[in-house]
Amino acid sequence: MVHLSTAQLIGYHVLTQRPPGHDSEAFFQQLSPEALYNHVFQQIDALRFFPQNIRYFLNLPVKVLINDDALLLKLCSSSSNITIKLQDPDIFYTLSTRQLSRLYKRIQQLEASGLPLWLDDFDEKMFATFSNKNWRLCGIKFDKKTFWHLVSELQKLRQAIFIGHKIATDVLMEGIETTEQRGIAFYAGATMEKDYLWPALLPDIY
């Protein structure tokens, strides 16, 4: 993750390496809530051996956050250099009013404990839903397809990022591949970027 105005490295997106040819999304979809819980904390434990002066962004399914009380408590006591990305915000549309209220309360609890929450793969169809709910988070990430769709229509891109800032402090664009696109994203109001234009530099393990 890179800051657009300074090109300063902000942090790393923590991913799970699967064997070649394996569908990662299908793998995680079939995992039980308990297995997902264990996976998240295996990642957190592994990060203790990496530099601590940088942020690490971890994916977390929305329903795991809603339903697992033990996970909430453990996250609240986790390292201050971790950011949680809710990886499936589209599931928002399937939640009941009670589940939405529970999710919002848990987001507030985590952020109050110093653990930032982001929405992953935000797209145009989510604008009205999230802004009308008056939810406020630390960050949102627009997926690369949304950026590529909007990059040639500057006014629409600016409007999308403006709405993004109503929901979150930081707006990250995925899919910037050229310095021209970087400039467009920056002047349209985005604050951060991941992948493509910058080399994938891995942190040294202690």
At which residue positions do the language-model features occur?
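Bacterial c-di-GMP phosphodiesterase EAL domain
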Residues: 1-78
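Hydrophobic/aromatic residues located in beta-strands of well-ordered beta-sheets
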Residues: 56, 82-84, 117, 171
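Acidic (Asp/Glu)-rich catalytic clusters
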Residues: 44-51, 67-83, 101-108, 112, ...
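EAL-family c-di-GMP phosphodiesterase catalytic domain
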Residues: 1-9, 16-20, 87-96, 120-125, ...
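Alpha-helix N-cap and loop-to-helix initiation/capping positions
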Residues: 31-35, 95-102, 149-152
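N-terminal-biased segments
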Residues: 55-72, 111, 116-141
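Short, well-ordered alpha-helical scaffold segments within catalytic/effector domains
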Residues: 37, 41, 100-104, 154-158
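Conserved anion-binding
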Residues: 78, 89, 107-115, 120, ...
